[in-house]
């Protein structure tokens, strides 16, 4: 009998075991679609980014004009740029929903997969930050100045570190050049980490909405979940193209239509929408080092999730107290996102401080307490 090439060829075998014959729980919902959507986001960003890089010039005197030239004179350059800029927003929407799914259904108990995932989030945030600087508009320049300056809060080595990162005494040409190099490199680091993420995931298999082992009821990934994923791709890409064509600047900052000017500070310096929650936490502490530590903690706290799990059930499906806390946390993050976009004045300051405090309280204190309480109520 002839060998099945799909199952025996050294390379095709890897594809087969990951995308075709992969045993998958039969009951995973649409919340499990976001992993593959993130893969599509990454591919889209790398392709559009590569096309943009062929026309971009990483020099302070030319960067802004090279982006304008791209949008005016390059065939479909405007579309490629709009897809790339808005693709970043979709990337973050998908990753936040993906993390939310992981928190709700207890996926973080696959510790290796979860930890690599958090590292992926940090890498994505770094990539988006350095990418935002490249068009060299006002918000690009001042965003880079403000955020890189935060490292000067590190005791003793801070200022040296910042000047080393800048390549001078302010954000200037060397900074732009190295940020372009980093922005080109990091997506490939993300692609590599994604393979590690999947390798760890396929060691244990996917979790499912019930949070119970599903070994007794697995189905092949293809055709069941390939067709389900394709529906997700179609919906996401349609939304992305619609946004890029009809309202490409909806999520951007108008300040970035003005070329970078070190002598004029914009009235409100703020990052893109997907960083606003962390920016609000940073600003809620009236101390530079404290703010930086809170900013770091707001993301790094995800590493603690497996350690804070006190419930004897994996998923929140049958845990109403934890569910209430989860949705309060979601609402809290939306409040933080709104506060991050507002000026530093009352009542926004106090709202931001309360929202920041409740963010950490819910994750570090209330979730573990709710888990213990539910165990007692259910006599587990």
Swiss-Prot record:
Signal peptide: none annotated. GO terms for biological process: mitochondrial electron transport, ubiquinol to cytochrome c. It comes from the Eukaryota. It is found in: Mitochondrion inner membrane. Heme b b566 binds at residues 98, 197. The keyword Protein transport does not apply. Pfam families: Cytochrom_B_C, Cytochrome_B. PROSITE patterns: CYTB_CTER, CYTB_NTER. Heme b b562 binds at residues 84, 183. The chain crosses the membrane at residues 34-54, 78-99, 114-134, 179-199, 227-247, 289-309, 321-341, 348-368. Binds 2 heme b groups non-covalently. Belongs to the cytochrome b family. The cytochrome bc1 complex contains 11 subunits: 3 respiratory subunits (MT-CYB, CYC1 and UQCRFS1), 2 core proteins (UQCRC1 and UQCRC2) and 6 low-molecular weight proteins (UQCRH/QCR6, UQCRB/QCR7, UQCRQ/QCR8, UQCR10/QCR9, UQCR11/QCR10 and a cleavage product of UQCRFS1). This cytochrome bc1 complex then forms a dimer. Heme 1 (or BL or b562) is low-potential and absorbs at about 562 nm, and heme 2 (or BH or b566) is high-potential and absorbs at about 566 nm. This is Cytochrome b. It comes from Vireo flavifrons (Yellow-throated vireo). The lineage of its organism: Eukaryota, Metazoa, Chordata, Craniata, Vertebrata. The gene is MT-CYB.
